[in-house]
């Protein structure tokens, strides 16, 4: 089959732009988008297997590629007018193949793979709208941005003969983002009037591999035991950590004594280990070499979850859950060192009729964090900070 869809969006949106005298200002910017989405697919369904081949093409066009505004706080040094680029035209294509096949009653295999490409080559704006810097030479006419993506997700499920009512799922997933955007030096002009030193663009890319094994055992009709192991390896470019390995061990107990009552207890332990931390710097603003970004720092996480589902009557469902997460960044000297989060959730849905459902929920989160910082380049004055956040929804 084949589908075509066009999305038109017009009007105004909030836009934040910097001006000379203050850090920024909000004002309405024009909005006029058009997205053309074309999808075609071939499907096969057999007694033992299914397959689907799909192609997607998306074209995004913006009739307003820039916005210009007057500076109400002009100082008379060429900052009377400012300009900024808006969302650029771009094109996305993706080809995917998904399928599943049942070899025997004990073994089933499924998988999905896709390759994609994103391209953006809208001409650059000048560094500044000011006549003094408007002709400052750019390294090239456009970004010539090219991004290639690929993903392979393979999984198989089969029953082991090691014990009765025991089954296992093994899965592997590879996800890659290959950024082919050229790297060049740029000489930006800050706030239209301040020429800055050279800086290069950073075409970020990553390569993620994930594999996992899950076991499920049902010793009785009302009881189920589950557990598993997962390893994820993430490789990055132009970032402080080039490689991260995270191992996850988990176990879960499920008890369903009645059809209207179901409870689950789950425990997870995650251990993230990184390669050598290499400070990238922020051009003319150096970073503390002891500082660690929390998403790239070594971390040990313990997480526990309790969840209960109740169905006292046919048209009423109640879910109550509680989880606690304890994070320890024991290798971080500057940055986030500890974090603890707890959450209580209540979800209720009531079906008035086949066409009407009433739904409500309540969530209370508590987050406690410990951070360390430094007030001197030599790190002789290290301070500690503590934060507490409460969020109710």
Language-model features and meaning:
Residues 1-393:
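Gram-negative and organellar
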């Amino acid at each position: 089959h084949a589908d075509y869809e066009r999305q038109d969006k017009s009007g105004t949106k909030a836009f934040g732009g910097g001006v000379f005298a203050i850090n920024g200002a909000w004002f309405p910017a024009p909005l006029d988008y058009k997205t053309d989405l074309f999808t075609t697919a071939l499907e096969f369904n057999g007694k033992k297997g299914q397959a689907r081949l799909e192609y997607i093409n998306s074209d995004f066009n913006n009739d307003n590629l820039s916005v210009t505004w007057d500076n109400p706080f002009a100082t008379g040094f060429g900052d009377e007018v400012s300009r900024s680029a808006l969302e650029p035209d771009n094109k996305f294509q993706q080809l995917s193949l998904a399928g599943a096949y049942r070899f025997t009653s004990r073994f089933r295999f499924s998988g999905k793979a896709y390759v994609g490409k994103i391209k953006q080559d809208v001409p650059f704006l000048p560094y500044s709208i000011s006549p003094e810097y408007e002709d400052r030479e750019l390294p090239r006419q456009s970004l010539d941005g090219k991004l290639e993506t690929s993903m392979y997700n393979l999984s198989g499920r089969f029953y082991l003969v090691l014990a009765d009512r025991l089954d296992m799922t093994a899965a592997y997933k590879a996800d890659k983002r290959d950024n082919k955007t050229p790297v060049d030096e740029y000489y930006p002009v800050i706030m239209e009037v301040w020429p800055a030193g050279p800086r290069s663009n950073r075409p970020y890319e990553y390569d993620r591999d994930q594999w996992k094994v899950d076991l499920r055992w049902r010793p009785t009709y009302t009881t189920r035991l589950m557990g598993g192991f997962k390893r994820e390896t993430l490789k990055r470019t132009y970032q402080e950590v080039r490689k991260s390995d995270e191992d996850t061990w988990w176990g879960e107990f499920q008890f369903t004594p009645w059809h209207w009552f179901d409870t689950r207890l789950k425990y997870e332990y995650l251990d993230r280990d990184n390669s050598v931390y290499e400070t990238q710097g922020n051009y003319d603003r150096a970073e503390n070499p002891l500082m660690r970004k929390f998403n790239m720092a070594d971390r040990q996480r313990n997480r526990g979850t309790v969840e209960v589902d109740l169905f006292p009557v046919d048209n009423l469902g109640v879910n109550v859950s509680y989880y606690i997460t304890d994070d320890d960044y024991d290798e971080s000297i500057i940055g986030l060192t500890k974090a603890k989060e707890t959450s209580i959730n209540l979800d209720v849905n009531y079906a008035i009729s086949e066409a009407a459902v009433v739904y409500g929920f309540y969530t209370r989160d508590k987050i406690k964090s410990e951070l360390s910082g430094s007030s001197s380049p030599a790190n002789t004055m290290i301070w500690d900070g503590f934060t507490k956040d409460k969020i109710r929804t």
